[in-house]
């Protein structure tokens, strides 16, 4: 499988700790401008203070009640709906120049494959769900499928922004205030909750960086291949 990136140089992986959402968003824009001007591909790995981010398709009933929750809601330029970010969740923002012809669906599938691989290495089987983005723990014994990682991207000038969020050891109660990603008939989970042991962000950070690099460069085979599409964003 070929690389989906337009340049062969190494991805600049930056591990940033905890970063305010607005600051990280501006950094993404600056890096995207630099990439369009000939700079390197970059992968930001970080955590955010508690924040809800609403994509362009978020409906009023999916939002938190502002009188009950003091967590800020940020309107973003990605597609999709609302989700939560906060401590214990690893967020990845790949700022990548995509090769022609653009296939954003294939790009998203590669991010999913990287997340599936890392979960499997930890001993957790995860998969895709048809018609729903992100990575899921399959339902069983009357328990619904549970989302463990969200993906929401934007592509402009053939360059990606936003990315993925993997729940490691985070406050799952924060998702109860919203309809996560607009999906009301499924749950949300974390690596720690599913594996019955503490899995911290630092435990998966390096593995995620390696898997994302391998997936984008074609070293990690896709278990599900898309047909080319003109999608510009998803969540």
Curated annotation (Swiss-Prot):
InterPro entries: aa-tRNA-synth_II/BPL/LPL (IPR045864), BPL_LPL_catalytic (IPR004143), Octanoyltransferase (IPR000544), Octanoyltransferase_CS (IPR020605). Keywords: Acyltransferase, Cytoplasm, Transferase. Residues 37-220 form the BPL/LPL catalytic domain. The keyword Transferase applies. It is found in: Cytoplasm. Pathway: Protein modification; protein lipoylation via endogenous pathway; protein N(6)-(lipoyl)lysine from octanoyl-[acyl-carrier-protein]: step 1/2. SUPFAM superfamilies: Class II aaRS and biotin synthetases (SSF55681). The keyword Transmembrane helix does not apply. Its EC number is 2.3.1.181. It is an enzyme of class 2 (transferase). GO terms for cellular component: cytoplasm. The record marks 147 as: Lowers pKa of active site Cys. GO terms for molecular function: lipoyl(octanoyl) transferase activity. CDD domains: LipB. Substrate binds at residues 78-85, 150-152, 163-165. Catalyzes the transfer of endogenously produced octanoic acid from octanoyl-acyl-carrier-protein onto the lipoyl domains of lipoate-dependent enzymes. Lipoyl-ACP can also act as a substrate although octanoyl-ACP is likely to be the physiological substrate. PANTHER family: LIPOYLTRANSFERASE 2, MITOCHONDRIAL-RELATED (PTHR10993:SF7), OCTANOYLTRANSFERASE (PTHR10993). Belongs to the LipB family. This is Octanoyltransferase. It comes from Mycobacterium leprae (strain TN). The lineage of its organism: Bacteria, Bacillati, Actinomycetota, Actinomycetes, Mycobacteriales.
